[in-house]
UniProtKB/Swiss-Prot annotation:
Cytoplasmic side: 1129-1163
Subcellular location: Membrane
FG-GAP repeat residue numbers: 23-78, 79-138, 340-391, 392-443, 444-504, 507-565, 570-630
Residues holding Ca(2+) 2: 530, 532, 534, 538
Quaternary data: Heterodimer of an alpha and a beta subunit. Alpha-X associates with beta-2.
Secretion signal, residue range per the UniProt entry: 1-19
Name of the molecule in the record: Integrin alpha-X
Motif, GFFKR motif: chain positions: 1131-1135
Disulfide bonds: 69-76, 108-126, 116-145, 495-506, 639-722, 655-712, 771-777, 848-863, 998-1022, 1027-1032
Native source organism of the sequence: Homo sapiens (Human)
Binding residues annotated for Mg(2+), in chain numbering: 157, 159, 161, 259
Record-listed Ca(2+) 1 binding positions: 466, 468, 470, 474
Length: 1163
C-alpha cells in the first residue's frame, strides 16, 4: 500500500488549470491491491479518507474490507473489524457514510448470505465506528430463518393388498419424516384408509402430546378395499379444520401413500381434487410397488398430486425403498417456506439487503433496504436505545414491487425539521425519489417526483444541497445515470425542496459534455462546499463511463436563486491525470479539510485507487486609478493650427489591492502571485491622443510579484498640444492577469484569481471646459433652413431634397451639439455637405444617422458635430440631402422640422426649433396611343353617296409610372357636319372590362366657316364638326396596367359632297385627364397624354367599258385576216401539207414488209 503523487508540470497542463478551482497539478493517489478498492469512499474526522473494497476476499466465506488513508502519511491501512462468522460474503464497504458531529463512520455490507434450508437469503450488516473503537453493530442481532407454520397430514393406505411387514415399514417411514421437523412450527395428523377410515391423531392431539411419536404406537392396519378419493375428501373436510387443531395461516400439506389404484370407491378424483385446490392444500403422492408401472395407475398419482406433477410425485418399487426418498420429501417441504401466503409476514425481509445505502440523521443512522417486501424496498431508522423503525410506502397504497426504494438515501433539513429522501430507481422502470417526514411519530410520504425515461435509473443517486449555507436544505440533486441521449449519457435533475405539502418538481437539469452516450453522468454526487469564495455551496458530479470508462468528474457552482449553475466550471477527465485510470468518478466524497490548509478537499474513487484533489485558494483584486491633474487644461490642447508643437505631462496613479476571497489557513506572506499589467490609452481609436512617456506609444506592460497588500505605481502620460477631439475624455484601460506562485510549504499549491473577478478597468481623463467662472456652460443655439431653388416637391421626379441648414451659437461653448431632423418615412437621410463656418478654431465634421420614431411612420435623423466643441459666436452652414422614395406618400404638404440641442442641458427656446412646409405633388407617367389595328381607308362612288360603312378606331392606354391613380379617358368623335350625319351609332367598348361604363355628350360645332377651313386642310375633326365626347372613368389605374378602347360606328358618305373635296381625313382624338392638384405628368412626357386616329375617305368616278370592248374586238379580227392572207400568198400552208403526206407514206411501208428507199438528198 503506497501513495503516489502525480505532479503535472507540462506547460499546457499548467495553462489549462490556472483558472480552475480543483488542483490537478499536485494530487495524491492512494492505491491498494484489493478487489473493489475505490468502489466507495468517504471523508472521515477531517483527517482520513475511508475507502471500501467490497470485493476483497479476506477469508473463506468473507468478502469486503475497509481502509483508512492519510494525506500526511500518504499510505492506507486496513481497518480491523471483528466480522462475525455468520456474516457470510457480506461485501463490507459497499456503502459508507460519515458525520462530523460527533465523528462517526458507518460501514455496511448489504450482501450477507443467510442459508435457511434450501433457500439463500440476503440480509445486511453495518458497523458504526467512533474515532477509536467499534460502538455498535446494525442490526444488533442476526435475523433468524423465517418460520413458516406447516400442518402436514399423512394419509396412508391400510387396504388388504399391503402385507403387515410392508405396513410396518411404511409406519417407520412416517415416524422418520415426523422426526425431521420441529415443533411448534410444524405439526402432523395421521389418517388410515381402506374402505374404512380411521383418524389416529389430529393436529390438536399432536400439539398436546409430550411425545408425538408415541401416537404412532396404536396404529394397526385396517384391511379392505382402496377408497382413496373418499379418504382425500375426509381429510379436506375434517382434519384441515380449526376444530381439529389446524391453523389458519399455516401451509397445508397432504402426503398420500398407497400401493395401487383405488378400488370400489364411488367417488372420482375429479370430485374431490378441486376441493383440495380450493382449500390451498399442497399434495404429495407416494406410489409403492410395481402396480404403478401401469399407465392407468400412474395417472391416478398425477390426479392426486399438486401441479406440476413431477415435483409432487414419488414412486418406489417397494416399501423398503421409502427410506431413500425421505430426505427428498423433507427438502421439498422445506422449499414451501419460500412461498407466499395471504397474510404471512415471515418472509418480508429475507432479501432486505440492509445497508445498501446509508446516511446519518439527528435521530440515528438510516440504512436502505432495497430488497424488502419483494424488492419494493424501504429503509430502517435506528434511534439510539430504541427499536428500529421501518420506513416504506406500504401506507400509500402504491404498487412499489421491484422499485428498489432505499437504493440511495439522503437527509434534508428545513428550519430544523428533518426529512428523509429515498431513491427508487426501478419504480415502474423509470425511477422515483420520495420525501418522507414524521407525522404523529409516523413516517409518511410528503412528496415524490418520478423519472421520465424507461431504464434511466432516476433516483440511483441523491445529494442534499444547502446552497446559501443557512442550515436548511434548498434543493435535492437526483441522478439518472442511465438516461440516454444520442450524444450524452446520464443527467442530474435539480429539484428544489418543496415547502409544506406542495407538489415536488424539478426546475433544471444538469448534463455532462456531449460525445459520451454511455458516460453515466450522475452515478455519484457530493457536496464540496464553497470553493470559489462566493459564499454559495458547490457540488461535484461523477461520470465514470466517459471516455470508454476512463471516467470524469464535473464541478458545478452554486448560484443565487438558490440553485446550481447549468454549466460546469471545470471538468477533470481521468485520462488527464493518468492513462491507467478506470471508472474515475464512480465514488465521491467532499466537504472536509483533509490537507490541513483550511480548504475543502475532494476524494474521487476509481478502480483500484482513490485520488485526493485539493481546492485552490481564491484571491480577489481591487483596483483604483487616478490622474494628476484631474483634467487636461485648455492651454494643453487648444490651438488654431493643426500642428503639434509641444507636449504636456500628466501622471496616472494605479493601485492594486489583493485579498483572500476563500477562507483558508494560509498566511498573507505565503500567498504571492505574478501579476501582469497591460495598459492602453484610447483603446478602440485609430490614433491615440496620449502616449506613455516610458514607451512613447499607447501601450505599456509590467510584471510584478505581489502579496496580500496594496501596491501602487505611477505612469507618466504625454499629450500633444493640438488635440482633434477635446470633448470625449481620454480613456486609460487596465487589463491584468494573475498567476499564483506555488506554495512550497503546502506541496506547491497555487492560489488563483476568482473566476468572476473583474479583469478590465478603465479611467477617464477629461478636458477642461471653457464655461466661465461658474463652470456651467450656457450655450444659446439657433437653427434655420430652406429649400434652395424648390417651390414644390414632385414625388417620383425629384429624387433628392436638399435643405440648406444654418446653425449658430450666441452663448458659451456648446458640447455634444446635435441637429435633429424630424421627417416622414418617405424621406431618408443620404449625406451632408459641409459648407461655411465662422468663429470655429478648426474644421467641423458632421456624423448623421437615422432611426424610426414611434409607430406613426416618422423618422428622426440626428447629425452630431463630431467630436468638437461648438464655440460661442460660431456659425455653420451645411447642406443636408434626403432621398425621396418614388413611392412615398407624403400628403399634399411636406413638413420638415429641425431641432438643435446639446449636452449643456440649456433650456430650449424658439430659436432651437425650425420647421418648413413644402407643397407636394406626385409624378405619374400615363400614355395613350393609337392602336395599329383600325380602319385606315374607305372609298365610295357617286352612286354610293347615300350609303355608309362600318369604321373602327382603337386606342391603347398604359400606366408606365410607379403609382396607381384615378384617371379619365376622353374620346372626341366627329358625328355631324352642317347638320348632316358623319359618323353614326358610335359606341365605346372596353373588352378587358365590359362592366366599365362610359358617359357621352354632344358638343356643338364652333361657329366658323367649315368650308374655308377644310379647303385649306382636308381634315374633319371636332374643330369644325359637331362631336360626340365619351368620358370613361377608371377609379384606380394600376402600375403597368394596359387598357384597350374601341370606337365603332357607321361612317356615312353623303356629307362629303358639301366639302367639294374628293379625299378627306376623319379624325378621332383620345386624351387622359386626372386631378392635376395631386398628380403631374413627368416633365417632358405631356405629349403622350393625347393621341388621334385618322381614317381616309375618298370619292371616285365609275367609267362605261362597252365602246372600248367593241372597238378592240373589230380591230383584232381585221388584223387576223390580214396576217392569214399574207401567209397564204407565200405558200406557208402548201408546204406544210406536202410534208405531212410524205410522213404518212413512210409509216405505212414498213408494215407491208417492203422498204421504201429514201429520196436522194438535195445537194
Amino acid at each position: 500500500m503506497t501513495r503516489t503523487r502525480a505532479a503535472l508540470l507540462l506547460f499546457t497542463a499548467l495553462a489549462t488549470s490556472l483558472g480552475f478551482n480543483l488542483d490537478t497539478e499536485e494530487l495524491t493517489a492512494f492505491r491498494v491491491d484489493s478487489a473493489g478498492f475505490g468502489d466507495s469512499v468517504v471523508q472521515y474526522a477531517n483527517s482520513w479518507v475511508v475507502v471500501g473494497a467490497p470485493q476483497k476476499i479476506t477469508a473463506a466465506n468473507q468478502t469486503g474490507g475497509l481502509y483508512q488513508c492519510g494525506y500526511s502519511t500518504g499510505a492506507c491501512e486496513p481497518i480491523g473489524l471483528q466480522v462475525p462468522p455468520e456474516a457470510v460474503n457480506m461485501s463490507l464497504g459497499l456503502s459508507l457514510a460519515s458525520t462530523t458531529s460527533p465523528s462517526q463512520l458507518l460501514a455496511c455490507g448489504p450482501t450477507v448470505h443467510h442459508e435457511c434450508g434450501r433457500n439463500m437469503y440476503l440480509t445486511g450488516l453495518c458497523f458504526l465506528l467512533g474515532p477509536t473503537q467499534l460502538t455498535q453493530r446494525l442490526p444488533v442481532s442476526r435475523q433468524e430463518c423465517p418460520r413458516q407454520e406447516q400442518d402436514i397430514v399423512f394419509l396412508i393406505d391400510g387396504s388388504g393388498s399391503i402385507s403387515s411387514r410392508n405396513f410396518a415399514t411404511m409406519m417407520n417411514f412416517v415416524r422418520a419424516v415426523i422426526s425431521q421437523f420441529q415443533r411448534p412450527s410444524t405439526q402432523f395428523s395421521l389418517m388410515q384408509f381402506s374402505n374404512k377410515f380411521q383418524t389416529h391423531f389430529t393436529f390438536e392431539e399432536f400439539r398436546r402430546s409430550s411425545n408425538p411419536l408415541s401416537l404412532l404406537a396404536s396404529v394397526h392396519q385396517l384391511q379392505g378395499f382402496t377408497y382413496t378419493a373418499t379418504a382425500i375428501q375426509n381429510v379436506v373436510h375434517r382434519l384441515f379444520h380449526a376444530s381439529y387443531g389446524a391453523r389458519r395461516d399455516a401451509a397445508k400439506i397432504l402426503i398420500v401413500i398407497t400401493d395401487g389404484k383405488k378400488e370400489g370407491d364411488s367417488l372420482d378424483y375429479k370430485d374431490v381434487i378441486p376441493m383440495a385446490d380450493a382449500a390451498g392444500i399442497i399434495r404429495y403422492a407416494i406410489g409403492v410397488g410395481l402396480a404403478f408401472q401401469n399407465r392407468n395407475s400412474w395417472k391416478e398419482l398425477n390426479d392426486i398430486a399438486s401441479k406440476p406433477s413431477q415435483e409432487h410425485i414419488f414412486k418406489v418399487e417397494d416399501f423398503d425403498a421409502l427410506k431413500d426418498i425421505q430426505n427428498q420429501l423433507k427438502e421439498k417441504i422445506f422449499a414451501i417456506e419460500g412461498t407466499e401466503t395471504t397474510s404471512s409476514s415471515s418472509f418480508e425481509l429475507e432479501m432486505a439487503q440492509e445497508g445498501f445505502s446509508a446516511v446519518f440523521t439527528p435521530d440515528g443512522p438510516v440504512l436502505g433496504a432495497v430488497g424488502s417486501f419483494t424488492w419494493s424496498g424501504g429503509a430502517f431508522l435506528y434511534p439510539p436505545n430504541m427499536s428500529p423503525t421501518f420506513i416504506n410506502m406500504s401506507q400509500e397504497n402504491v404498487d412499489m414491487r421491484d422499485s428498489y426504494l432505499g437504493y440511495s438515501t439522503e437527509l434534508a433539513l428545513w428550519k430544523g425539521v428533518q426529512s428523509l429522501v429515498l431513491g427508487a430507481p426501478r419504480y415502474q422502470h423509470t425511477g422515483k425519489a420520495v420525501i418522507f417526514t414524521q407525522v404523529s411519530r409516523q413516517w409518511r410520504m410528503k412528496a415524490e417526483v418520478t423519472g421520465t425515461q424507461i431504464g434511466s435509473y432516476f433516483g440511483a443517486s441523491l445529494c442534499s444541497v444547502d446552497v446559501d449555507s443557512d442550515g436548511s436544505t434548498d434543493l435535492v440533486l437526483i441522478g439518472a445515470p442511465h438516461y440516454y441521449e444520442q450524444t450524452r449519457g446520464g443527467q442530474v435533475s435539480v429539484c428544489p425542496l418543496p415547502r409544506g405539502w406542495r407538489r415536488w418538481w424539478c426546475d433544471a437539469v444538469l448534463y455532462g459534455e456531449q460525445g459520451h452516450p454511455w458516460g453515466r453522468f450522475g452515478a455519484a454526487l457530493t457536496v464540496l462546499g464553497d470553493v470559489n469564495g462566493d459564499k454559495l455551496t458547490d457540488v461535484v458530479i461523477g461520470a465514470p463511463g466517459e471516455e470508454e470508462n476512463r471516467g470524469a468528474v464535473y464541478l458545478f457552482h452554486g448560484v443565487l436563486g438558490p440553485s446550481i449553475s447549468p454549466s460546469h466550471s471545470q471538468r477533470i477527465a481521468g485520462s488527464q491525470l493518468s492513462s491507467r485510470l478506470q471508472y474515475f468518478g464512480q465514488a465521491l466524497s467532499g466537504g472536509q479539510d483533509l490537507t490541513q490548509d483550511g480548504l475543502v478537499d475532494l476524494a474521487v474513487g476509481a478502480r483500484g485507487q482513490v485520488l485526493l484533489l485539493r481546492t485552490r485558494p481564491v484571491l480577489w483584486v481591487g483596483v483604483s486609478m487616478q490622474f494628476i491633474p484631474a483634467e487636461i487644461p485648455r492651454s494643453a490642447f487648444e490651438c488654431r493650427e493643426q500642428v503639434v508643437s509641444e507636449q504636456t505631462l500628466v501622471q496616472s496613479n494605479i493601485c492594486l489591492y489583493i485579498d483572500k476571497r476563500s477562507k483558508n489557513l494560509l498566511g498573507s506572506r505565503d500567498l504571492q502571485s505574478s501579476v501582469t499589467l497591460d495598459l492602453a490609452l484610447d483603446p478602440g481609436r485609430l490614433s491615440p491622443r496620449a502616449t506613455f512617456q516610458e514607451t512613447k506609444n499607447r501601450s505599456l506592460s509590467r510584471v510584478r510579484v505581489l502579496g496580500l497588500k496594496a501596491h501602487c505605481e505611477n505612469f507618466n502620460l504625454l499629450l500633444p498640444s493640438c488635440v482633434e477631439d477635446s470633448v470625449t475624455p481620454i480613456t486609460l484601460r487596465l487589463n491584468f492577469t494573475l498567476v499564483g506562485k506555488p506554495l512550497l510549504a503546502f506541496r506547491n499549491l497555487r492560489p488563483m484569481l476568482a473566476a468572476d473577478a473583474q479583469r478590465y478597468f478603465t479611467a477617464s481623463l477629461p478636458f477642461e471646459k471653457n464655461c466661465g467662472a461658474d463652470h456651467i456652460c450656457q450655450d444659446n443655439l439657433g437653427i434655420s433652413f430652406s429649400f434652395p431653388g424648390l417651390k414644390s416637391l414632385l414625388v417620383g421626379s425629384n429624387l433628392e431634397l436638399n435643405a440648406e441648414v444654418m446653425v449658430w451659437n450666441d452663448g458659451e461653448d456648446s458640447y455634444g451639439t446635435t441637429i435633429t431632423f424630424s421627417h416622414p418615412a418617405g424621406l431618408s437621410y443620404r449625406y451632408v455637405a459641409e459648407g461655411q463656418k465662422q468663429g470655429q478654431l478648426r474644421s467641423l465634421h458632421l456624423t448623421c444617422d437615422s432611426a424610426p420614431v414611434g409607430s406613426q411612420g416618422t423618422w428622426s435623423t440626428s447629425c452630431r458635430i463630431n467630436h468638437l466643441i461648438f464655440r460661442g459666436g460660431a456659425q455653420i452652414t451645411f447642406l443636408a440631402t434626403f432621398d425621396v422614395s418614388p413611392k412615398a406618400v407624403l400628403g399634399d404638404r411636406l413638413l420638415l422640422t429641425a431641432n438643435v440641442s446639446s449636452e449643456n442641458n440649456t433650456p430650449r427656446t424658439s430659436k432651437t426649433t425650425f420647421q418648413l412646409e413644402l407643397p407636394v405633388k406626385y409624378a405619374v407617367y400615363t400614355v395613350v396611343s393609337s392602336h395599329e389595328q383600325f380602319t385606315k381607308y374607305l372609298n365610295f362612288s357617286e352612286s354610293e353617296e347615300k350609303e355608309s360603312h362600318v369604321a373602327m378606331h382603337r386606342y391603347q392606354v398604359n400606366n408606365l409610372g410607379q403609382r396607381d391613380l384615378p384617371v379619365s379617358i376622353n374620346f372626341w368623335v366627329p358625328v355631324e357636319l352642317n347638320q348632316e350625319a358623319v359618323w353614326m351609332d358610335v359606341e365605346v367598348s372596353h373588352p378587358q372590362n365590359p362592366s366599365l361604363r362610359c358617359s357621352s355628350e354632344k358638343i356643338a360645332p364652333p361657329a366658323s366657316d367649315f368650308l374655308a377651313h377644310i379647303q385649306k386642310n382636308p381634315v374633319l375633326d371636332c374643330s369644325i364638326a359637331g362631336c360626340l365626347r365619351f368620358r370613361c372613368d377608371v377609379p384606380s389605374f394600376s402600375v403597368q396596367e394596359e387598357l384597350d378602347f374601341t370606337l365603332k360606328g357607321n361612317l356615312s358618305f353623303g356629307w362629303v359632297r358639301q366639302i367639294l373635296q374628293k379625299k378627306v381625313s376623319v379624325v378621332s382624338v383620345a386624351e387622359i385627364t386626372f386631378d392635376t392638384s395631386v398628380y403631374s405628368q413627368l416633365p417632358g412626357q405631356e405629349a403622350f397624354m393625347r393621341a388621334q386616329t385618322t381614317t381616309v375617305l375618298e370619292k371616285y368616278k365609275v367609267h362605261n367599258p362597252t365602246p372600248l370592248i367593241v372597238g378592240s374586238s373589230i380591230g383584232g379580227l381585221l388584223l387576223l385576216a390580214l396576217i392569214t392572207a399574207v401567209l397564204y400568198k407565200v405558200g406557208f400552208f402548201k408546204r406544210q401539207y406536202k410534208e405531212m403526206m410524205e410522213e404518212a407514206n413512210g409509216q405505212i411501208a414498213p408494215e407491208n414488209g417492203t422498204q421504201t428507199p429514201s429520196p436522194p438528198s438535195e445537194k
